[in-house]
Amino acid sequence: MSGSGSEQTPRLTRSSSRSTLTGVASGRVEKIRSSPKSLDRIAKKYKDFDPETAKIIRADLEETQADKTMEVGGSTQESAQQITGAKRPNEEDQGGAQEAAKRVNRSNKVNSLLTSNGVTDPAKSKISNYIVGRLNANNIEADSVMVAECTNIAIHAWKEGKKYLDDKIISQATTTIPTLITNLVSNANTLSNVIASLNNVPDKLVSDIRTQVENVSNQTGQKAAKRDVLLKSSESIYNNAVKESKVDFINNYLTSSGVNVDELRKDSHHYRTVVSRIEKKYTVLVMMPEHEEHHTLKEKVATNRTFVKESAQTLSQKYVTQ
Protein backbone atom coordinates (compact mmCIF):
# COMPACT_ATOMS: atom_id res chain seq x y z
CA MET A 1 0.00 0.00 0.00
CA SER A 2 1.36 3.42 -0.88
CA GLY A 3 0.40 6.80 0.45
CA SER A 4 1.71 10.23 1.32
CA GLY A 5 2.18 12.01 4.61
CA SER A 6 2.08 10.17 7.91
CA GLU A 7 0.58 6.87 6.77
CA GLN A 8 -0.73 4.75 9.61
CA THR A 9 -1.12 0.99 9.70
CA PRO A 10 -4.69 -0.35 9.22
CA ARG A 11 -6.11 -2.45 12.02
CA LEU A 12 -8.33 -5.48 11.74
CA THR A 13 -10.81 -5.75 14.59
CA ARG A 14 -13.14 -8.69 14.87
CA SER A 15 -16.48 -9.26 16.63
CA SER A 16 -18.66 -12.35 16.72
CA SER A 17 -20.73 -11.21 13.76
CA ARG A 18 -18.55 -8.95 11.65
CA SER A 19 -15.07 -7.68 10.92
CA THR A 20 -14.18 -4.04 10.42
CA LEU A 21 -11.06 -2.80 8.67
CA THR A 22 -10.13 0.77 9.52
CA GLY A 23 -7.48 2.66 7.58
CA VAL A 24 -6.30 6.20 7.09
CA ALA A 25 -4.61 5.91 3.70
CA SER A 26 -6.39 8.33 1.37
CA GLY A 27 -8.14 9.69 4.47
CA ARG A 28 -11.06 7.28 4.53
CA VAL A 29 -12.41 4.40 6.56
CA GLU A 30 -13.49 1.11 5.04
CA LYS A 31 -16.21 -0.78 6.90
CA ILE A 32 -16.69 -4.35 5.81
CA ARG A 33 -19.50 -6.65 6.86
CA SER A 34 -19.48 -10.38 6.38
CA SER A 35 -22.05 -11.82 4.00
CA PRO A 36 -24.45 -14.50 5.26
CA LYS A 37 -23.59 -18.01 4.11
CA SER A 38 -25.76 -21.04 3.58
CA LEU A 39 -24.41 -23.57 6.06
CA ASP A 40 -26.22 -26.38 4.28
CA ARG A 41 -24.54 -25.46 1.00
CA ILE A 42 -21.15 -25.29 2.64
CA ALA A 43 -21.64 -28.57 4.46
CA LYS A 44 -22.67 -30.25 1.21
CA LYS A 45 -19.64 -28.83 -0.56
CA TYR A 46 -17.34 -30.44 1.98
CA LYS A 47 -19.31 -33.65 2.43
CA ASP A 48 -16.14 -35.77 2.53
CA PHE A 49 -15.16 -34.25 5.86
CA ASP A 50 -16.48 -35.43 9.19
CA PRO A 51 -18.59 -33.05 11.36
CA GLU A 52 -15.60 -31.75 13.30
CA THR A 53 -13.89 -30.69 10.10
CA ALA A 54 -17.09 -29.24 8.69
CA LYS A 55 -17.30 -26.99 11.74
CA ILE A 56 -13.77 -25.76 11.09
CA ILE A 57 -14.52 -25.04 7.44
CA ARG A 58 -17.85 -23.36 8.14
CA ALA A 59 -16.29 -21.14 10.77
CA ASP A 60 -13.49 -20.17 8.43
CA LEU A 61 -15.75 -19.39 5.48
CA GLU A 62 -18.23 -17.44 7.57
CA GLU A 63 -15.74 -15.38 9.53
CA THR A 64 -13.24 -14.67 6.78
CA GLN A 65 -15.66 -13.37 4.17
CA ALA A 66 -14.93 -9.93 5.59
CA ASP A 67 -11.36 -10.71 6.61
CA LYS A 68 -10.45 -11.67 3.07
CA THR A 69 -11.02 -8.15 1.84
CA MET A 70 -7.77 -6.24 2.14
CA GLU A 71 -6.84 -2.70 1.23
CA VAL A 72 -4.09 -2.76 -1.39
CA GLY A 73 -2.84 0.34 -3.15
CA GLY A 74 -5.77 2.43 -1.96
CA SER A 75 -8.46 0.10 -3.29
CA THR A 76 -10.22 -2.94 -1.92
CA GLN A 77 -9.39 -6.27 -3.48
CA GLU A 78 -11.89 -9.09 -3.00
CA SER A 79 -10.62 -12.62 -2.51
CA ALA A 80 -11.43 -15.48 -4.82
CA GLN A 81 -13.78 -18.16 -3.58
CA GLN A 82 -13.19 -21.78 -4.66
CA ILE A 83 -10.21 -22.46 -6.90
CA THR A 84 -10.75 -24.09 -10.25
CA GLY A 85 -9.73 -21.46 -12.78
CA ALA A 86 -13.33 -20.25 -13.04
CA LYS A 87 -14.03 -16.54 -13.21
CA ARG A 88 -14.15 -14.46 -10.07
CA PRO A 89 -17.11 -12.18 -9.39
CA ASN A 90 -17.19 -9.12 -11.69
CA GLU A 91 -14.21 -10.44 -13.63
CA GLU A 92 -15.75 -10.27 -17.12
CA ASP A 93 -14.54 -6.72 -17.73
CA GLN A 94 -11.11 -7.24 -16.21
CA GLY A 95 -9.44 -9.71 -18.55
CA GLY A 96 -11.25 -12.72 -17.12
CA ALA A 97 -9.77 -15.29 -19.49
CA GLN A 98 -6.22 -14.15 -18.77
CA GLU A 99 -6.75 -14.21 -15.01
CA ALA A 100 -8.37 -17.64 -15.19
CA ALA A 101 -5.34 -18.92 -17.09
CA LYS A 102 -3.06 -17.56 -14.37
CA ARG A 103 -5.08 -19.41 -11.74
CA VAL A 104 -4.80 -22.65 -13.69
CA ASN A 105 -1.03 -22.13 -13.90
CA ARG A 106 -0.84 -21.54 -10.14
CA SER A 107 -2.84 -24.69 -9.52
CA ASN A 108 -0.62 -26.72 -11.84
CA LYS A 109 2.52 -25.44 -10.12
CA VAL A 110 1.24 -26.26 -6.65
CA ASN A 111 0.03 -29.70 -7.72
CA SER A 112 3.37 -30.42 -9.39
CA LEU A 113 5.18 -29.57 -6.16
CA LEU A 114 2.76 -31.71 -4.19
CA THR A 115 3.29 -34.66 -6.52
CA SER A 116 7.07 -34.37 -6.31
CA ASN A 117 6.77 -34.47 -2.53
CA GLY A 118 4.70 -37.62 -2.34
CA VAL A 119 1.11 -36.33 -2.24
CA THR A 120 -0.99 -38.72 -4.32
CA ASP A 121 -3.49 -37.23 -6.79
CA PRO A 122 -3.06 -33.66 -5.47
CA ALA A 123 -5.76 -32.18 -7.72
CA LYS A 124 -8.33 -33.90 -5.46
CA SER A 125 -6.63 -32.83 -2.24
CA LYS A 126 -8.26 -30.32 0.09
CA ILE A 127 -4.74 -29.18 0.96
CA SER A 128 -4.03 -28.37 -2.68
CA ASN A 129 -7.34 -26.51 -3.03
CA TYR A 130 -6.67 -24.43 0.07
CA ILE A 131 -3.18 -23.42 -1.05
CA VAL A 132 -4.24 -22.45 -4.56
CA GLY A 133 -7.24 -20.63 -3.12
CA ARG A 134 -5.07 -18.48 -0.89
CA LEU A 135 -2.78 -17.66 -3.82
CA ASN A 136 -5.76 -16.78 -5.98
CA ALA A 137 -7.25 -14.70 -3.18
CA ASN A 138 -4.90 -11.85 -3.98
CA ASN A 139 -4.39 -12.67 -7.66
CA ILE A 140 -0.72 -11.79 -7.24
CA GLU A 141 2.07 -13.75 -8.92
CA ALA A 142 4.94 -12.60 -6.71
CA ASP A 143 4.18 -11.08 -3.33
CA SER A 144 6.09 -11.48 -0.07
CA VAL A 145 2.93 -12.04 1.97
CA MET A 146 1.89 -14.87 -0.33
CA VAL A 147 5.35 -16.42 -0.02
CA ALA A 148 5.17 -16.17 3.76
CA GLU A 149 1.72 -17.70 3.64
CA CYS A 150 2.95 -20.55 1.46
CA THR A 151 5.67 -21.09 4.05
CA ASN A 152 3.03 -21.56 6.74
CA ILE A 153 0.96 -23.78 4.51
CA ALA A 154 3.92 -25.95 3.62
CA ILE A 155 5.22 -26.22 7.16
CA HIS A 156 1.82 -27.01 8.66
CA ALA A 157 0.27 -29.14 5.93
CA TRP A 158 3.11 -31.27 4.72
CA LYS A 159 4.80 -31.72 8.07
CA GLU A 160 1.55 -32.95 9.61
CA GLY A 161 0.73 -35.00 6.53
CA LYS A 162 4.09 -36.73 6.58
CA LYS A 163 3.40 -37.94 10.10
CA TYR A 164 0.70 -40.18 8.68
CA LEU A 165 1.46 -40.75 5.02
CA ASP A 166 5.23 -41.06 4.73
CA ASP A 167 7.46 -43.91 5.89
CA LYS A 168 10.32 -41.48 6.37
CA ILE A 169 10.85 -40.24 9.92
CA ILE A 170 10.92 -36.45 9.94
CA SER A 171 14.38 -35.20 10.75
CA GLN A 172 14.79 -33.22 13.96
CA ALA A 173 17.78 -31.29 12.65
CA THR A 174 17.95 -27.71 13.82
CA THR A 175 17.21 -24.81 11.48
CA THR A 176 17.93 -21.13 11.92
CA ILE A 177 14.36 -19.92 11.67
CA PRO A 178 14.90 -16.13 11.29
CA THR A 179 17.36 -16.67 8.43
CA LEU A 180 15.09 -19.19 6.73
CA ILE A 181 12.04 -16.96 6.88
CA THR A 182 13.93 -13.81 5.90
CA ASN A 183 15.25 -15.53 2.79
CA LEU A 184 11.82 -16.85 1.90
CA VAL A 185 10.07 -13.53 2.31
CA SER A 186 12.75 -11.60 0.41
CA ASN A 187 12.55 -13.94 -2.58
CA ALA A 188 9.09 -14.39 -4.07
CA ASN A 189 10.05 -17.50 -6.05
CA THR A 190 11.09 -19.84 -3.26
CA LEU A 191 8.08 -22.11 -2.80
CA SER A 192 10.15 -25.05 -4.06
CA ASN A 193 12.83 -24.18 -1.51
CA VAL A 194 10.19 -24.19 1.21
CA ILE A 195 9.15 -27.70 0.23
CA ALA A 196 12.77 -28.87 0.06
CA SER A 197 13.54 -27.56 3.54
CA LEU A 198 10.60 -29.17 5.34
CA ASN A 199 12.43 -32.23 6.62
CA ASN A 200 14.89 -30.00 8.45
CA VAL A 201 12.26 -28.14 10.47
CA PRO A 202 11.38 -29.79 13.81
CA ASP A 203 7.71 -29.84 14.81
CA LYS A 204 8.39 -27.91 17.99
CA LEU A 205 9.55 -24.91 15.95
CA VAL A 206 6.30 -24.46 14.03
CA SER A 207 5.05 -21.77 16.40
CA ASP A 208 8.42 -20.01 16.19
CA ILE A 209 8.18 -20.06 12.41
CA ARG A 210 4.74 -18.48 12.52
CA THR A 211 6.04 -15.76 14.84
CA GLN A 212 8.98 -15.07 12.57
CA VAL A 213 6.72 -14.82 9.54
CA GLU A 214 4.75 -12.13 11.33
CA ASN A 215 7.88 -10.28 12.40
CA VAL A 216 9.51 -10.38 8.99
CA SER A 217 6.30 -9.32 7.25
CA ASN A 218 6.19 -6.33 9.57
CA GLN A 219 9.86 -5.49 9.02
CA THR A 220 9.49 -5.57 5.25
CA GLY A 221 6.61 -3.10 5.33
CA GLN A 222 3.53 -5.30 5.24
CA LYS A 223 0.46 -3.77 6.84
CA ALA A 224 -1.27 -5.11 9.92
CA ALA A 225 -4.43 -6.02 8.02
CA LYS A 226 -2.56 -8.25 5.59
CA ARG A 227 -0.53 -9.72 8.44
CA ASP A 228 -3.70 -10.58 10.36
CA VAL A 229 -5.15 -12.30 7.31
CA LEU A 230 -1.89 -14.20 6.79
CA LEU A 231 -1.85 -15.53 10.34
CA LYS A 232 -5.55 -16.35 10.36
CA SER A 233 -5.17 -18.15 7.06
CA SER A 234 -2.27 -20.22 8.30
CA GLU A 235 -4.29 -21.37 11.31
CA SER A 236 -7.28 -22.45 9.24
CA ILE A 237 -5.01 -24.11 6.69
CA TYR A 238 -3.28 -25.96 9.52
CA ASN A 239 -6.57 -27.31 10.85
CA ASN A 240 -7.75 -28.45 7.44
CA ALA A 241 -4.40 -29.98 6.51
CA VAL A 242 -4.20 -31.97 9.73
CA LYS A 243 -7.70 -33.30 9.20
CA GLU A 244 -7.02 -34.11 5.55
CA SER A 245 -3.87 -36.05 6.39
CA LYS A 246 -5.76 -37.96 9.08
CA VAL A 247 -8.52 -38.86 6.62
CA ASP A 248 -5.90 -40.11 4.16
CA PHE A 249 -4.23 -42.15 6.88
CA ILE A 250 -7.52 -43.68 8.00
CA ASN A 251 -8.43 -44.65 4.43
CA ASN A 252 -5.01 -46.22 3.81
CA TYR A 253 -5.30 -48.03 7.13
CA LEU A 254 -8.77 -49.37 6.31
CA THR A 255 -7.61 -50.55 2.88
CA SER A 256 -4.61 -52.38 4.33
CA SER A 257 -6.96 -54.06 6.81
CA GLY A 258 -9.08 -55.57 4.04
CA VAL A 259 -11.83 -52.96 3.95
CA ASN A 260 -13.27 -51.75 0.64
CA VAL A 261 -13.04 -48.03 1.41
CA ASP A 262 -14.69 -46.88 -1.84
CA GLU A 263 -17.74 -49.00 -1.08
CA LEU A 264 -17.80 -48.03 2.59
CA ARG A 265 -17.66 -44.30 1.86
CA LYS A 266 -20.80 -44.53 -0.26
CA ASP A 267 -22.65 -44.64 3.07
CA SER A 268 -21.26 -41.77 5.15
CA HIS A 269 -23.03 -43.03 8.30
CA HIS A 270 -21.43 -46.47 8.03
CA TYR A 271 -18.05 -44.90 7.27
CA ARG A 272 -18.21 -42.74 10.40
CA THR A 273 -19.44 -45.74 12.41
CA VAL A 274 -16.41 -47.84 11.49
CA VAL A 275 -13.96 -45.02 12.16
CA SER A 276 -15.65 -44.25 15.48
CA ARG A 277 -15.42 -47.89 16.56
CA ILE A 278 -11.72 -47.92 15.83
CA GLU A 279 -11.07 -44.68 17.67
CA LYS A 280 -13.02 -45.79 20.73
CA LYS A 281 -11.19 -49.11 21.01
CA TYR A 282 -7.75 -47.82 20.04
CA THR A 283 -6.28 -44.35 20.34
CA VAL A 284 -4.04 -45.10 17.39
CA LEU A 285 -6.00 -42.92 14.98
CA VAL A 286 -6.15 -39.93 17.27
CA MET A 287 -3.59 -37.21 16.55
CA MET A 288 -0.24 -38.44 17.77
CA PRO A 289 1.85 -36.35 20.18
CA GLU A 290 4.86 -34.68 18.60
CA HIS A 291 7.29 -37.11 20.22
CA GLU A 292 5.54 -40.13 18.67
CA GLU A 293 7.48 -41.07 15.56
CA HIS A 294 5.99 -42.69 12.51
CA HIS A 295 7.47 -46.16 13.05
CA THR A 296 5.82 -46.28 16.50
CA LEU A 297 2.49 -45.48 14.86
CA LYS A 298 2.95 -48.24 12.29
CA GLU A 299 3.76 -50.77 15.01
CA LYS A 300 0.50 -49.93 16.79
CA VAL A 301 -1.73 -50.23 13.74
CA ALA A 302 -0.20 -53.56 12.72
CA THR A 303 -2.00 -55.36 15.58
CA ASN A 304 -5.43 -53.82 14.93
CA ARG A 305 -6.27 -54.99 11.41
CA THR A 306 -8.57 -57.88 12.34
CA PHE A 307 -10.72 -55.64 14.52
CA VAL A 308 -10.92 -53.05 11.75
CA LYS A 309 -12.08 -55.58 9.17
CA GLU A 310 -14.65 -57.08 11.53
CA SER A 311 -16.00 -53.61 12.37
CA ALA A 312 -16.85 -53.04 8.72
CA GLN A 313 -18.02 -56.62 8.10
CA THR A 314 -20.68 -56.44 10.82
CA LEU A 315 -22.34 -53.62 8.86
CA SER A 316 -22.19 -55.35 5.48
CA GLN A 317 -20.21 -58.11 3.80
CA LYS A 318 -19.74 -55.86 0.78
CA TYR A 319 -17.47 -53.61 2.84
CA VAL A 320 -14.68 -56.18 3.04
CA THR A 321 -12.40 -57.51 0.34
CA GLN A 322 -11.79 -61.23 -0.11
Swiss-Prot record:
Q: Is Phosphoprotein among the key words of this record?
A: yes
User: Can you summarize the PTM annotation of this record?
Assistant: Phosphorylated by host kinases.
Amino acid composition bias (Polar residues), ranges on this chain: 1-10, 74-84, 107-117
Q: Where in the cell is it found?
A: Virion; Host cytoplasm
**Annotated Gene Ontology cellular component terms:** host cell cytoplasm; virion component
Q: Indicate, by first and last residue, each region the UniProt record lists as having compositional bias (Low complexity).
A: 11-22
Q: Where is the composition biased (Basic and acidic residues)?
A: 28-46, 60-70
Keywords, sorted A to Z: Chaperone, Host cytoplasm, Phosphoprotein, Viral RNA replication, Virion
Q: For the region Disordered, give the residue spans.
A: 1-46, 60-117
What this chain does, per the record?
Non catalytic polymerase cofactor and regulatory protein that plays a role in viral transcription and replication. Stabilizes the RNA polymerase L to the N-RNA template and binds the soluble protein N, preventing it from encapsidating non-genomic RNA.
Q: How does it assemble?
A: Homotrimer when phosphorylated. This trimer is stabilized by binding to the L protein. Binds soluble protein N, and ribonucleocapsid.
- The protein depicted here goes by the name Phosphoprotein
**Species assigned in the record:** Rice yellow stunt virus
Biological classification of the source: Viruses, Riboviria, Orthornavirae, Negarnaviricota, Haploviricotina
Tell me what gene encodes this: P
